[in-house]
């Protein structure tokens, strides 16, 4: 036989509401949840600014003691189309993991590109990586991106809309992409070039 609560016990329960400390703790938890949501939203906004394109996915093998270990290698170009671009390489046992590592590696090797008002580059530039040589030069508005392969991908994700590019030597996508990155990293605005050389803009153009 179970004991039923008396009227006095019921009255004491109703007369004693939850303490104010418990209410304050709930409010604090809600505030912390809101702060976490804001931080998550700002991170998602930053991530949404970046675009990634897979240039190449290859199946590679590594000889180990027990035989051959198969994996995937992904070449990924990352950029925000606002003057920042990077090339990354990722290896993993599956394609998704290789692409994810390539994106992370590309964001670690970003290059800032000076853009002109017509979304071109200020001067001619050359880049080399291994046996690949890349030449890029500015173009007039309306020209578009005259390039091919991985070089075109790098230039587009950098935010360049009018440019001429020429590939010399190796046709390897990774070497060409890295050569284009070298060429972009050597670009300087006219003001910075005159400042580095210690001359005025008039002397630079003359």
From Swiss-Prot:
* This protein's GO CC annotations: small ribosomal subunit
The record's annotation in PANTHER family points to: MITOCHONDRIAL RIBOSOMAL PROTEIN S5 (PTHR48277:SF1)
Protein name as catalogued: Small ribosomal subunit protein uS5
Q: Name one GO biological process term.
A: translation
Question: Keyword Ribonucleoprotein, does the record have it?
Answer: yes
Where is region (Disordered) located? 1-52
Q: Which residues form the S5 DRBM domain?
A: 50-113
| UniProt family annotation | Belongs to the universal ribosomal protein uS5 family.
Q: Which UniProt keywords apply?
A: Ribonucleoprotein, Ribosomal protein, RNA-binding, rRNA-binding
Please quote what the entry notes about the protein's domains.
Answer: The N-terminal domain interacts with the head of the 30S subunit; the C-terminal domain interacts with the body and contacts protein S4. The interaction surface between S4 and S5 is involved in control of translational fidelity.
Q: Which SUPFAM superfamilies match?
A: dsRNA-binding domain-like (SSF54768), Ribosomal protein S5 domain 2-like (SSF54211)
Q: Where is the composition biased (Basic and acidic residues)?
A: 24-52
Listed Polar residues bias regions: 1-23
Question: What the protein does?
Answer: With S4 and S12 plays an important role in translational accuracy. Located at the back of the 30S subunit body where it stabilizes the conformation of the head with respect to the body.
InterPro entries, A to Z: Ribosomal_Su5_D2-typ_SF, Ribosomal_uS5, Ribosomal_uS5_bac-type, Ribosomal_uS5_C, Ribosomal_uS5_N, Ribosomal_uS5_N_CS, Ribsml_uS5_D2-typ_fold_subgr
Q: Which Pfam families match?
A: Ribosomal_S5, Ribosomal_S5_C
The protein's assembly and partners: Part of the 30S ribosomal subunit. Contacts proteins S4 and S8.
Q: Which Gene3D superfamilies match?
A: 3.30.160.20, 3.30.230.10
Which terms in the Gene Ontology molecular function aspect does this entry carry? rRNA binding; structural constituent of ribosome
